[in-house]
Design a protein with these regions (language model features):
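Catalytic cores of alpha/beta
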Residues: 35-40, 115-125, 176-189, 241-243, ...
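Alpha-helix-loop-beta-strand connector modules within alpha/beta enzyme cores
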Residues: 83-100, 148-170, 214-248, 287-301
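N-terminal capping/small domains of soluble enzymes
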Residues: 1-103, 108-110
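C-terminal helical cap(s) of enzyme catalytic domains, especially alpha/beta-barrels
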Residues: 61-71, 205-220, 277-300
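Hydrophobic faces of well-ordered beta-strands that scaffold small-molecule active sites
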Residues: 24-28, 47-51, 103-107, 131-133, ...
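Glycine-rich phosphate-binding active-site loops on the catalytic face of alpha/beta enzymes
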Residues: 51-56, 134-137, 193-203, 253-254, ...
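Glycine/Thr-rich beta-alpha phosphate-binding loop at enzyme active sites
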Residues: 74-75, 137-152, 182-246, 282
C-alpha cells in the first residue's frame, strides 16, 4: 500500500458498448424499480440502476411469505412480481430519469414470444441505456425448465429481444454444469454482455412445523448474499477466460469495496450490489467509495486497469515457466 493515496482515480468503465461513469450498479429485484433508493442514494452517482425484472404484462408473483433470512444472505421467492413494461414506463421510469439515473431495464418471459413483446415495448424509451435479459425463468414450452438451463432456449430468448434496438446483457443462472456454453449461446444470439450470476436454487424448512418457510412451497427460492460470492467470482473468472473481449457484470454477495475489487480482478467490467441494500440502503455508494479508496491507496490510476488482472498474472507466470523450462533444456544441450 502507498504511503500517500492518489488524488484522483479514473473510475470510468464500459460494459459492451455502454459507457458508465463508474463500475457500481444496483442489482435487479433488490431495490424495487430503483427510485425507492433515491432517499438514500444519489442515483446519478451510480454507474447505472438496474430495475426489477418486467414482463410484457403485469404479473402477481408468488404467495407470501416471500423472503427468508439465512446466516449469510437470504432466500427469496418473490416470483418476478411487476406492473408490466408499459405501466413501468409510464409510472416508474420518469422518476429515475428525473434523478439523472442511467437505467438498465430487466425483462423476462414465460415463452420466447413474451421476451419479444417485452423488448418491443422498450423501443425508443428515453433514459434506458441497456436491456438485461433475465433468462432464469420457467419456459412453458419446455416443461417449465428454466431458459437459463438450456443453451438453445437461452439463444432463442435473447435473439427474440433484438427488436428493442438497445444493447442487451444476458443474466445467467449458476445452477448449470455448462455455464460457459450457455453464455456463448447468449452472446451468439446478440447479447454484448453477461451478467453473472443470478441466485442459487435453495430451500428452507421450518423444523418445528415441518413445513416450507416460503409461500412457493416445494418450488423453494433463490439464495443471494455473501454466501454466493465465491460462486459468482468463479463464474466471472471462467467466462472471462473463455470470452476475452465481451462485457461482464459480476453480481452476487458484493457488500464491500474489496468485494468489487475481487470481481473486477476476476474479469468483471462492473458489479451489481443487491442483497446488501436490505441491510443498508446506501450500500451501493459505500461499495463505490470503498473501491475508489482501495484504488487510491494501491496506486491504481484507472479502475479498468485491474479488470481481469488475475488472468494476465497467470499468463505471465506461465510464460515465465515456459521460458525457464526452455532455458534449462538449452543449458542441458550445451552442457
Amino acid at each position: 500500500m502507498r504511503q500517500w493515496p492518489l488524488r484522483h482515480v479514473d473510475m470510468r468503465t464500459r460494459v459492451g458498448s455502454v459507457s458508465l461513469p463508474n463500475p457500481v450498479l444496483t442489482a435487479s429485484g433488490t431495490a424495487g424499480h430503483g427510485a425507492e433508493l433515491g432517499s438514500y442514494v444519489d442515483l446519478a452517482s451510480l454507474g447505472a440502476v438496474v430495475v426489477k425484472s418486467l414482463a410484457a404484462e403485469p404479473w402477481a408473483g408468488n404467495p407470501a411469505p416471500r423472503v427468508h433470512e439465512t446466516p449469510a444472505g437470504m432466500i427469496n421467492s418473490v416470483g418476478l412480481q411487476g406492473p408490466g413494461v408499459s405501466r413501468w414506463v409510464e409510472d416508474e421510469l420518469p422518476a429515475l430519469v428525473n434523478r439523472g439515473a442511467r437505467v438498465v431495464a430487466s425483462i423476462w418471459g414465460r415463452r420466447v414470444e413474451d421476451y419479444a413483446r417485452a423488448a418491443a415495448l422498450l423501443v425508443g424509451v428515453p433514459g434506458v441505456v441497456a436491456v438485461e435479459v433475465n433468462v432464469s425463468c420457467p419456459n412453458l414450452d419446455d416443461r417449465s425448465r428454466m431458459f437459463a438451463h438450456s443453451a438453445t432456449a437461452t439463444f432463442d430468448a435473447v435473439a427474440a429481444t433484438a427488436v428493442c434496438g438497445l444493447p442487451r446483457w444476458v443474466k445467467l443462472s449458476p445452477n448449470v454444469a455448462d455455464l460457459v456454453d450457455i453464455a456463448g449461446a447468449g452472446l451468439n444470439a446478440g447479447a454484448e454482455a453477461l451478467v453473472l450470476i443470478n441466485t442459487l436454487l435453495a430451500m428452507a424448512i421450518d423444523p418445528r412445523r415441518g413445513t416450507y418457510r416460503l409461500g412457493s412451497g416445494s418450488g423453494g427460492g433463490g439464495l443471494s448474499g455473501p454466501a454466493i460470492r465465491p460462486v459468482a467470482v468463479r463464474a466471472v473468472h471462467d467466462c472471462r477466460a473463455a470470452f476475452a473481449t465481451v462485457g461482464i457484470v459480476g453480481v452476487g454477495g458484493v457488500t464491500r469495496g474489496i468485494d468489487a475489487v475481487e470481481m473486477l480482478m476476476a474479469g468483471a467490467d462492473a458489479v451489481e450490489v443487491g442483497t446488501a441494500t436490505f441491510r443498508e440502503p446506501r450500500a451501493p455508494v459505500q461499495v463505490l467509495a470503498g473501491l475508489q479508496r482501495w484504488c487510491r491507496w494501491n496506486g491504481v490510476e484507472r479502475v479498468r486497469s485491474i479488470v481481469g488482472v488475475v488472468h494476465k498474472a497467470a499468463a505471465e507466470s506461465q510464460s515465465i515457466a515456459v521460458t525457464q523450462s526452455t532455458d534449462a533444456t538449452t543449458g542441458d544441450d550445451h552442457g
